[in-house]
Design a protein with these regions (language model features):
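Non-catalytic accessory regions flanking glycosidase/transglycosidase catalytic cores in CAZymes
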Residues: 3, 7-21, 27-283, 326-359, ...
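Beta-strand-rich domain onsets/edges
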Residues: 321-322
């Protein structure tokens, strides 16, 4: 008879240790009294979880910058040189390793020079998103006043503890301007005219910006390049960039979700010029939005979207199913990249991810792409972060879209009002993973049956990831089941649990969300783990995200 451990090894998915059962009958029913089981294999390290996986994305879109981050130096709203103080306070709790700016699509229409120099002399420009913004949107959403530029963004990063990640304009600015932007940010004090300009703005010391995106979604109207054409553009932009003795990490514009032809075309074109060309790329950007909830009925961008607040159990599972595709995308693009970049020098950078719903749930009128995140989005975000945690050898960075007042926001703000969304709470709960050693964990649970347009189907029963800091195990668990608890036995092998804490985010209403009027509808609850001489058993509530921090003997 096959040993139980060997059965688990063979049944688990190689990439993440996620066990999917094709039958509603539990294959482990006779092995444990609990309905579900998690086996943490502490000896099987997957790699170090880069804190950059917990990155963020800010763009001059809707109320992200103006009204979200930037309130102005003369505002009555508490601020630090114009930056919303309450936002900074909460961001420090999530340890934002890296923050991306100014886009996104906005980046390929942005001239960095417009956002430096005396604030009163900066030009006003038509925002790239002008045609998307609502007619009742504030003028700052449609016409960029450039009050928040490079200096202010770097100051924001320093206040919150994140590293800046700047995206260069490849569509409408020459490579020379990319070099000049790097010079403005990184040249030593007093060394160049641009260093003097930076000093005049209040920063004599260099910003030391390491991460630079070379364009954004260059396959689309932000370049309309073929992959071979973009490879030539990337080579030109990367041919010479001033480094000032410190390495720069250049991030290339990657595919539109599952477009493997873009990935192959880009890497083959680079390789034709020699291996050193591939080695000039630090990361390959991959974007994935879970937007199509039409269940195969349409691929239309507008008609396929679901509602952020009005959804049923089927819509719940369909969003998670769409989100889980990112793991397949990581695997397929990674495999293809390895055919050309055989040493896997280039890593994946998932610098845009999250759900994208149709308009209508915004709490601030005029914020066209603002969404109200619910418990569904919290579970989605936990699931996605767990996928990144389980792939630390492949994913070097990830950036949730977006930080505030747009799409999968961690925070919502308007004027003097501010609230942490369920997504923001998830990011704080996952902090213990940052910098930890990811270890393989096998999650076992009966699949969840549900009816999908008259046809029976299933969804997995538990999901999560595990990491270790010294003797401390961080284990995050998502229970996607909208109805049932999951009583789960947790095994850590020979290293027995001594003590621990458990933090759970859940709500009986899967539509629950936090608002300016009711800020604490969805909040995490923390308590001490009850650990005895018998097996550790934890009951995970329906539709929940849980973090366990366990001290091991």
């Amino acid at each position: 008879m096959m040993e139980r451990r060997e059965f688990l090894r063979q049944a688990a998915l190689t990439a993440g240790g996620l066990l999917l059962f094709r039958s509603p009958i539990s294959a482990l029913a006779a092995a444990t009294s609990a309905a579900c089981r998690i086996e943490v294999l502490l000896a099987e390290e997957l790699g170090t979880i880069s804190p950059n996986i917990y990155g963020h994305f800010t763009e001059n879109l809707s109320g992200v910058i103006y009204d979200g981050i930037w309130v102005g130096k003369n505002s009555k709203i508490p601020n630090n040189d114009g930056i919303r103080s309450e936002l900074v306070e909460h961001m420090r709790k999530i340890k934002p390793a890296v923050i991306r700016f100014p886009g996104g699509c906005f980046a390929d229409s942005y001239d960095w020079r417009d956002g430096v120099g005396p604030a009163g002399k900066r030009p006003r420009r038509t925002n790239f998103w002008n045609g998307v913004e609502a007619s009742n949107a504030p003028a700052t959403h449609r016409f960029d006043p450039n009050q928040f530029g490079t200096d202010e963004f770097v100051h924001f990063c320093r206040l919150t503890g994140g590293q800046p990640y700047l995206a260069a304009n490849v569509r409408s600015l020459p490579a020379e301007e990319f070099n000049r932007w790097v010079e403005y940010c990184n040249s030593p004090a007093g060394s160049t005219t641009l260093a003097d300009m930076r000093a005049a703005g209040g920063s004599s010391d260099p910003f030391d910006v390491r991460y630079w995106g070379v364009g954004n979604e260059s396959w689309g109207c932000w370049g309309n390049f073929l992959p071979q054409e973009y490879a030539a553009e990337f080579r030109r932009y990367a041919a010479w960039v001033p480094g000032y003795g410190k390495p720069l990490s250049l991030i290339a514009s990657g595919p539109n979700s599952d477009d493997l032809n873009w990935t192959r075309g880009f890497f083959e074109a680079l390789a034709r010029k020699g291996k050193d060309q591939i080695n000039s790329v630090y990361g390959f950007a991959l974007h994935h939005y879970a937007w199509n909830l039409a269940r195969g009925k349409t691929q239309d961008w507008d008609q396929g979207k679901g509602d952020a607040l009005k959804f049923d159990a089927v819509d719940w599972y369909e969003l998670l199913r769409e989100g889980q595709k990112i793991e397949d995308l990581i695997d397929s693009h990674w495999k293809l990249m390895g055919e050309i970049d055989t040493e896997h020098y280039v890593k994946l950078v998932v610098d845009e991810w999250g759900p994208w719903y149709k308009p209508g749930s915004e709490q601030t009128p005029g914020d066209a792409l603002e969404q109200t995140p619910t418990m569904r989005d919290a579970v989605f975000s936990g699931m996605t972060l767990d996928i990144f945690n389980r792939n630390p050898d492949k994913v070097a960075m990830a950036n949730c879209a977006q930080l505030i007042n747009c799409l999968n926001s961690l925070y919502l703000a308007h004027e003097d009002k501010f609230v942490v969304t369920p997504v923001g709470h998830v990011f704080e709960m996952y902090v213990p993973h940052q910098g930890g050693k990811a270890v393989r964990a096998i999650f076992y649970a009966p699949p969840i049956p549900y009816d999908r347009d008259g046809k029976p189907t299933e969804f997995w029963g538990l999901h999560g990831s595990a990491s270790v800091h010294g003797k401390t195990l961080a284990l995050t668990v998502v229970n996607p089941n909208v109805r049932d608890v999951c009583e789960t036995e947790i095994s850590t092998g020979a290293a027995k649990p001594k003590s621990g804490m458990i933090t759970t985010l859940s709500n009986p209403d899967i539509h629950a969300y936090n608002s300016f009027q009711q800020r604490d509808v969805v909040v995490p609850r923390t308590s001490e783990l009850k650990i005895g001489d018998s097996a550790l058993v934890v009951t995970f509530p329906p539709a929940s995200v849980t973090t366990l921090q366990i001290e091991l003997g």
